[in-house]
């Protein structure tokens, strides 16, 4: 739309969702950027104090970039997610500037802006995105007009977890750089590692690190190695599940050199491309709001003043991505009929009657952590597959087991992710209901780990499984599955209803578990 965004036009972007107030101008490239971060004298960020900082610094920050007001074609602002007081301060300023300059207002999702500035800065087109910041930790991918969330933190964001640990040891805010510096002098210590499918949980890890009596450098090393390995694992799982070939790291925690190194190694092993934007575009910044506002404006996405309320819980998957017209791809790699297949955690040799699943070492993980996970998961998988089968749950027959390898029956059928339909998803619901009825949670319920055969859905890949009759564990199990369906299908509600029908038909405790799953879903918000 050349009349809306002429060649010499600029978009003014205002970012202020949390601690950093930032303004930028974007045309064909970044023209100007100025920021004023709020640094608390002690402890963490207090929302009211951050908003007061933004209000007092707004005039100076905007005036530093707004040198040619006649060229402004729109004012973009971070509409959410974020801290309510900070969002309100920025939104008020954006509305005033929109009126004063007589230009449209564009409301930008903060999370999507991180992704879009990353795509612009790296040239990546359709990546799996690891978005790691203070309050947000998500794995995203694009499909048919929206960014879909493959997995996310179930409690606190990675950056906030690092800050919480840093405060407990009187380290400066933000805590990530200080932890990274101390970790260079440390040695590995074992800490809790919590991955649930493509979701993660950091609170137990952070609490254990805070309570550790080990030298601070060692705790920082163990904390980084554990938290980042969790992030890379779920990113690899999304990459393997979706069949994409690019990984993009965005968000403030993405500035950490060790996290970048681990992702780069993982991508090299998988033959995928990896990229991270320059540091300017990683933390919260006005450039990402201005750029995303620009491409939204070019596609006619503007916001009437009377609809410009802030959205503190605004999720990336709520945004209609009108500026991307391609459908996006998932499952571009077809099903394996034989030979060797590579999943996120293992190499699988598919024979005529047997499957040999061998867990391979991950070069991105610290060796001691890698050995521990391989041993624990191999033992647990074989034991729980056999236990579930004895209880009547459709699973493969276990033939043999070693320290890192399981030989099992080959299930000849269709992998569920290639044949998703209400009738097949109902079978999945029945299988999971029976599994939960035996006191086992799968831990990685995705459509990659289910095979439809002879009117049954066979459950495979029990590497993250555990024995539990807790409603919480079962609810998280279902949340992982529903998140997978929502991120990779267009008829999610219909499929979810079919799953619930099958699950409820065989499991008496289904109602309580489904209610808990909804609670878990609501936790996946800006924290």
UniProtKB/Swiss-Prot annotation:
It catalyses: L-seryl-[protein] + ATP = O-phospho-L-seryl-[protein] + ADP + H(+); L-threonyl-[protein] + ATP = O-phospho-L-threonyl-[protein] + ADP + H(+); L-threonylcarbamoyladenylate + adenosine(37) in tRNA = N(6)-L-threonylcarbamoyladenosine(37) in tRNA + AMP + H(+). The active site is at 444 (proton acceptor). Fe cation binds at residues 110, 114, 131, 284. ATP binds at residues 340-348, 357. Coiled coil: none annotated. Binds 1 Fe(2+) ion per subunit. In the N-terminal section; belongs to the KAE1 / TsaD family. In the C-terminal section; belongs to the protein kinase superfamily. Tyr protein kinase family. BUD32 subfamily. Component of the KEOPS complex that consists of Kae1, Bud32, Cgi121 and Pcc1; the whole complex dimerizes. This is Probable bifunctional tRNA threonylcarbamoyladenosine biosynthesis protein. It comes from Methanoculleus marisnigri (strain ATCC 35101 / DSM 1498 / JR1).
